[in-house]
Regions:
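Mg2+-dependent prenyl diphosphate-binding active-site environment of isoprenoid biosynthetic enzymes
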Residues: 1-168, 175-185
């Protein structure tokens, strides 16, 4: 469908997210404006937009590992963190539980992005279901291009372990999140 339709689809999904957040029922800990605020902070200038700007500015230029982590923290990781935090807030999570969900989302989001970078250089387009090597073609910084494939795999494994560890306070009651991590990370 092309880039234009993809941008419009993203816009539609974002506005739908705000619509749903606005319709969410308050809990005794979280009010409707908490849900909308969480989404707005994630989609706004300090998170998603900042990460995308850094990503676009880095194309075709040398990017440090710290800059790449910044991009991933403000894009993929921020979106996944927001998703699990909103779920926790809707379930009336305690502050401790919400912090565990925040940690999980952060680590699973970073791990997902590192794994995506690895797959982009190790699998074919047919295996990926999308164009392989696209990042390299536009000289986009990735973990394999900065630290190599072996180190990227180690980083992904460490982040994955941290994501699973973040769920320990739930003592087996986070089966759906564990399944999400299994799906995203394997």
């Amino acid at each position: 469908y092309g880039e234009g339709i993809a941008v419009l689809a993203g816009d539609a999904l974002l506005t739908l997210a705000f619509e749903l957040a606005n319709q969410a029922r308050a809990t005794n800990r979280y009010k409707q404006n908490d849900f909308v605020g969480e989404l707005a902070r994630t989609a706004g200038h300090a998170q998603l937009i900042a990460g995308q700007v850094a990503d676009l500015e880095g194309e075709g230029k040398p990017v440090s590992r710290a800059q790449l982590r910044y991009i991933h923290e403000h894009k993929t990781s921020a979106l996944l963190t927001c998703s699990v935090r909103l779920g926790g807030m809707l379930a009336n999570a305690t502050p401790r539980q919400l912090q565990a969900l925040t940690d999980f989302g952060h680590h699973v989001g970073l791990a997902f992005q590192v794994i995506d970078d690895i797959l982009d250089v190790t699998l074919s387009s047919e295996q990926l279901g999308k164009t392989a090597g696209k990042d390299a073609a536009v000289q986009k910084a990735t973990y394999p291009s900065i630290v190599g494939l072996a180190k990227s795999r180690k980083i992904a494994a460490d982040l994955t372990a941290m994501a699973y560890a973040a769920l320990k306070p739930f003592k087996g009651q986070a089966v759906v999140l564990e399944a999400l991590a299994d799906y995203l990370l394997k």
